[in-house]
Regions:
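Asp/Glu-rich intrinsically disordered low-complexity tracts
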Residues: 8, 18, 23-29, 37-43, ...
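Pore-lining transmembrane helices
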Residues: 5
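Active-site-adjacent structural elements in enzyme catalytic cores
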Residues: 67, 78, 88-437
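Short, positively charged and aromatic/hydrophobic N-terminal segments
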Residues: 59, 66-68, 73, 81-90
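Serine residues within intrinsically disordered or low-complexity segments
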Residues: 32, 45-46, 58, 65, ...
């Protein structure tokens, strides 16, 4: 039998972060009960030398935590088993590091951006996967790292209003200026005619460009230090639930990017609202934290594109991220039930029991107020309001994968206000498999 290898562990190599099941992090920051996952011949006692900083520790809801200070060769693919996921070596294999966003880490991240590399960073919505938005080759690395189709446009992120004008081909309208004053910095993206400075692959060949001014201080500082607009979709593998914690990013992008800035959990929890400003009336292409009613109150009117709650038609091009493909999806099959709560609960119980009898591993996603309707069946909480659902939805979908669920049954909410953003994300995760009860 092959003997597990032992390593010398110089301090110089102790800057990498790795995922550990939450049960293996002691309250004092050490590591315990790791023998099932670590094949180092010292067992758990050897692992206990590496400590998690509780001030910087990012907990993955119900699943794992990021352990800072562990040397990567100790936690190699040979000696450490990552539960619930696999990592494929290949062209993307990089030494992915996770750092707290202090000034030194931000300067290093900005240098990587300027050098055409990729950095994951927190925003108030979700974590973004950033590259120099004026460098077509750097932008192409985003598509490659994510496995993202080339016809799915990106958003440029700026850190000042002055940075907008060079990116767009015309002066913003008075309506756009009012919306900037009301919602920037914040979770609103606006689409304008694209200037010649913006590479075509940022906009997937469209003659428009999507621009956002985020409010998260880490995002703002990174953009300012980089000195360029940062092109950034969500920092996950294409089709997966968007990341709202650094642990989610590491789960999807480990080995594919060089650096993750860990700014803690995101506040909003769903991506920004995307509004097309090229017509007479602001048109919502992707709902988010800024609602249609809020936009109408500032702009005088707003309209919601029909594709928000349906797949694109054959030959229809996506004008915004999140319009064309199945997004945000867990590994299991997801079905959404809409209707009166007790009737919905009855249908979900019936579907759950049928899946269980078929040998599947079902899971129910429900509002807190309805949990009692499901008895002792497995239920993941969606929160107690549409706002709470928006904040926790992507983490819940990732938890479903951690639990090994292969048949998911979710309650719906009414598609208005923030509920429209929730139903848009749930709908795309379920390929719009919505059952009316």
């Amino acid at each position: 039998m092959e003997q597990p290898r032992r390593f010398d562990l110089p301090r110089a190599c102790m800057r990498t972060a790795v995922l550990l099941p939450a049960a293996h992090l002691r309250e004092d920051g050490g590591v315990s009960a790791c023998r099932a996952h670590l094949r180092e011949d010292g067992g758990a006692s050897s692992a206990a030398r590496f400590r998690a900083d509780p001030r910087r520790n990012s907990n993955l809801r119900g699943g794992a935590s990021i352990l800072y200070g562990a040397p990567r060769q100790f936690f190699s693919r040979r000696n450490f088993r990552f539960p619930h996921r696999s990592v494929t070596k290949g062209a993307f294999y990089l030494n992915t590091r996770v750092l707290p966003p202090d000034e030194a880490a931000l300067k290093e991240a900005a240098a990587l951006i300027r050098g055409g590399r990729l950095v994951a960073f927190p925003t108030e919505t979700v974590y973004g996967l950033g590259a120099n938005g004026l460098d077509a080759e750097a932008v192409s690395r985003i598509f490659a790292a994510k496995g993202r189709p080339g016809d799915n446009p990106l958003i440029l992120h700026i850190a000042s209003l002055d940075a907008l004008r060079p990116l767009i081909a015309c002066e913003p309208s008075e309506t756009a200026r009012r919306m900037m004053r009301a919602f920037w910095p914040g979770p609103l993206t606006m689409i304008f005619p694209r200037s010649g400075r913006v590479p075509a692959n940022v906009s997937a060949g469209l003659d428009t460009v999507a621009v956002r001014f985020p409010s998260h201080p880490v995002a703002q500082r990174l953009i300012a230090l980089s000195g360029v607009p940062i092109a950034a979709p969500s920092a996950n593998r294409s089709g997966r639930p968007s990341p709202t914690a650094a642990a989610h990013v590491l789960e999807d992008m480990d080995g594919r990017i060089e650096l993750i800035l860990d700014g803690g959990a995101c506040d909003v929890g769903v991506e920004s609202t995307v509004v097309d400003m090229t017509g007479a009336t602001p048109r919502i292409l992707r709902p988010g934290g800024v609602t249609a009613a809020q936009i109408a109150a500032v702009a005088g009117a707003s309209e919601v594109d029909p594709a928000v709650m349906r797949p694109l038609k054959e030959g229809e091009r996506p004008r915004s991220p999140g319009m064309k493909y199945r997004h945000y999806a867990p590994a299991g099959d997801l079905t959404i039930f809409h209707g009166e709560p007790t009737a919905v609960a009855a249908r979900i119980r019936e579907s759950y029991d049928a899946a269980l009898n078929d040998g599947r591993r079902p899971l129910i996603l429900a509002l807190d107020a309805h949990r009692a309707l499901y008895g002792d069946r497995r239920v993941e909480s969606l929160g107690d309001s549409p706002e709470a659902m928006a904040h926790s939805l992507f983490a819940v979908l990732r938890d479903a994968d951690t639990l090994g669920a292969d048949a998911l049954f979710s309650e719906a909410v009414e598609a208005d206000g923030v509920g429209l953003a929730v139903m848009n994300r749930l709908g795309r995760a379920a390929a719009f498999h919505i059952v009316e009860v």
